Regions:
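Class I S-adenosyl-L-methionine-dependent methyltransferase catalytic core
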Residues: 1-297
Length: 297
């Protein structure tokens, strides 16, 4: 860890605009050739452009980046491509295998960062990675969303005229996975993950969370706001908030990148009289430990 933190990191923006153009290329093209084809099985994947933008802005080569719920390893892969070291944790064994294959693939493509990977419950991350306490420059992660925002289809054109089939939109049936918890359980578990991850931060390190509003039984839920409140209860203070575009930008207009099922759910909500819109961005929330801010006064 060759970079010594400075006071400026507490307010560092690295000249980022408030709206990040992270959807210029479709997600499929962002991953093509950089991740294994099997990675598409995961129901919720962070855009590689979001991960690389955050890592490039808030860390230096040689720094440590951690993702406590790493999925297919997007955060880790982008980190080691940018000459950062990475450590990740994933609950489901099958996804750990996907992450490991992606990391090996990254090294085969010339990535030089080192990595560590563990299979387990992210609520125990501070114990599993106790040797990393006080060393991470950045924790970058995202909570799981509902299955209505994820998945791929086989249309009637692909399956001989049959019905539209949805696949790759669910996690395993293991009830220990936070994706299966009610909203209160999800937030409680995510709060414990944030608290544990904060213990791994070096002084003035950053916790970054990507999150979007969701609908539960038709009701729009301000999940970003709830994550901010949850973080505050666990000693993390919101420092910055950005819009990371899922859509593209062309000639001052948005280019739709919405998935089939996001559009379908939006139409269904509108048919029920709900003023629903397809999501064009994720909130990127940056936090610092309250203790770091207090110590700087």
């Amino acid at each position: 860890m060759n970079h010594q933190p400075t006071r400026n990191e507490l307010t560092r923006r690295e000249f980022l605009a408030s709206v990040l153009a992270t959807g210029q290329r479709p997600s499929r093209l962002q991953r093509h050739g950089r991740y294994t084809p099997e990675s598409m099985r995961h129901p919720g994947k962070m855009l590689p452009a979001i991960a690389s933008t955050v890592i490039d802005a808030f860390t230096q080569p040689g720094d440590l980046v951690i993702d406590p719920m790493c999925g297919i390893g997007t955060t880790l892969v982008e980190a080691i491509h940018l000459r950062r070291d990475a450590a990740g944790m994933e609950y489901e064994r099958a996804f750990v295998d996907l992450t490991l294959n992606n990391l090996r693939h990254a090294h085969a493509q010339g990535a030089t960062g080192r990595y560590q990977l563990a299979c387990g419950d992210a609520r125990t991350i501070a114990t599993v990675y106790k040797e990393l306490r006080g060393k991470a420059a950045l924790v970058l992660t995202s909570p799981p969303y509902g299955s209505h925002t994820h998945g791929h289809i086989r249309s009637s054109r692909d399956n001989g005229g049959g019905k539209v089939l949805k696949r790759h939109h669910r996690y395993s049936t293991d009830r220990g996975n936070l994706a299966h918890q009610p909203l209160s359980g999800l937030l409680d578990g995510f709060g414990r993950i944030l608290a544990g991850s904060a213990l791994l931060l070096r002084p003035c390190g950053v916790v970054a969370v990507t999150v979007r509003p969701i609908r539960v039984k038709g009701e729009l839920i301000d999940l970003p706001g709830m994550v901010i409140d949850t973080a505050a209860r666990n000693g993390l203070i919101l420092a910055s908030r950005y819009a990371a575009l899922l859509a593209g930008l062309r000639g001052g207009r948005l280019v739709n990148r919405t998935s089939f099922f996001q559009m379908l759910e939006t139409r269904r909500a509108r048919d029920r009289g709900l003023p629903a819109c397809a999501t064009a961005h994720e909130d990127l929330l940056l936090f610092h430990r309250a203790a770091d801010l207090q110590g700087d006064r």
